[in-house]
Amino acid sequence: MEVTAQLVKELRDRTGAGMLDCKKALEDTGGNIEEAITWLREKGITKAAKKSDRVAAEGLVGLVTKGDKQIIFEVNSETDFVAKNKQFKDLMATVGETLINNDPKTVEDVLKVSVNGEPLETVIVHAIATIGEKITLRRFKTVHLKTDQSLGVYLHSNNRIATVLIFSGKIDETIGKQLAMHVSAMRPQFISRDDISVDFLNSEKPILTAEAKNDPKNAGKPDNILEKMVEGRLNKQLAEISFLDQVFVVNPDQKISDVIKANNVNVVDMIRYEVGEGIEKEELDFASEVMAQVLK
């Protein structure tokens, strides 16, 4: 039986599976809709499709290295229960190995890479069917070190935060790790004040000005005094979000800029991943979260 666009659409409407999966299912079953549905179920694709609109904001971050290449990546699940289990950690290892042994530019690229004869995307679909939660490879970034560069890397013990720092010049491995650990803990948004955008400054100053004017303690103070207060608060805020301006957590007597200068290096790039950052997560109480696991 010919596999028509109408048949593919009907199968997609009934199962929620992707168009290509539906087409493949129909081709392998001679265009028989019911057999195609069974085919999709056996492959775990129907089950995965039903979870596609759920929020996956938990998971793990990982670091993999090969030669001059370093990759930081994040794989998400719906709950931290799943992120702690062996199957999920095995999947993390597979994703990391696939990333480091290939040269994908985008998530879409790496999902197409063959792993033991099937695309990584299919491997993830099988994991979804087995584990029972939505799982996604959210993002990754590849660093190719130049000969005059060095790295500072840190992966927190719970695998929820990771940082990669790239330096021009050679830095001691321990100090590089300590600086990466600092970034993981203190969350600087920019390397230096020079990197802070004009848009950020233009959005922050009016907020600080309004806060100062609305503070009862500032009632009656002239505008020039309020302006100086706002500038002081803005400078303090910029120091808090600028890596080089921050106080070094390992040695509070030093600023990060002092450590960088003492080691004769410059910070070229700063990459910090934290699981789920920027994802709007559905709030569940603990009992509801447990029941959600039971009812999967």
Swiss-Prot record:
GO MF annotation, one: translation elongation factor activity
CDD domains, per the entry: UBA_EF-Ts
Region (Involved in Mg(2+) ion dislocation from EF-Tu): 79-82
Keyword Cytoplasm attributed: yes
Entries under SUPFAM superfamilies matching the protein: Elongation factor Ts (EF-Ts), dimerisation domain, UBA-like
UniProt keyword annotations, A-Z: Cytoplasm, Elongation factor, Protein biosynthesis
Domain of life assignment: Bacteria
InterPro entries: EF-Ts_dimer_sf (IPR036402), Transl_elong_EFTs/EF1B (IPR001816), Transl_elong_EFTs/EF1B_dimer (IPR014039), Transl_elong_Ts_CS (IPR018101), UBA-like_sf (IPR009060)
Location relative to the cell: Cytoplasm
UniProt-listed PANTHER family: ELONGATION FACTOR TS, ELONGATION FACTOR TS, MITOCHONDRIAL
Function field: Associates with the EF-Tu.GDP complex and induces the exchange of GDP to GTP. It remains bound to the aminoacyl-tRNA.EF-Tu.GTP complex up to the GTP hydrolysis stage on the ribosome.
Family of this protein: Belongs to the EF-Ts family.
Name this polypeptide is given: Elongation factor Ts
Organism: Spiroplasma citri
The encoding gene: tsf
